[in-house]
A protein has these predicted regions:
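Catalytic domains that recognize anionic headgroups
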Residues: 1-122
């Protein structure tokens, strides 16, 4: 399986890989896991049928796809122990704001980064 942003199944592949690794470790082992979900990165237009260019709609579709894969990952952690989850992005993305596209620029949208942390209870 591939994990790259051009694979429409990348998040499912990443979660499959992560769950497989978790299940191989003894349940009493402490685990640190970092997953960079590539589906949200461009290109993400392939998450909307017929779309040829990334935009807010395709970005939202990619986010919904990644969100749909998280329950399997969270359940694998719940089978082990209480787990601290930290979810964040490395940068935001412009989709036409002030005439800018994507994230290789200095713009407020690029610096706007979502963050959430929570405890998954066993």
């Amino acid at each position: 399986p591939t994990f790259g942003c051009t694979d429409k199944n990348s998040a499912a592949n990443q979660v499959d890989f992560a769950v497989d690794k978790l299940e191989k470790y003894p349940a009493d082992w402490k685990v640190f896991m970092y997953i960079n979900f590539s589906a949200i990165h461009y290109p993400n237009c392939h998450y909307v049928e017929g779309k040829k260019k990334d935009d807010k709609e395709s970005h939202a579709a990619a986010l919904r796809y990644v969100d749909s894969q998280l329950p399997r990952l969270f359940e694998a952690f719940r089978r082990r122990s209480d787990t601290l989850v930290i979810a964040l992005s490395d940068h935001g993305t412009c989709y036409g704001e002030d005439g800018y596209e994507y994230h290789c620029i200095s713009h407020e949208k690029v610096y706007t980064v979502p963050y959430k942390h929570f405890i998954l209870r066993k």
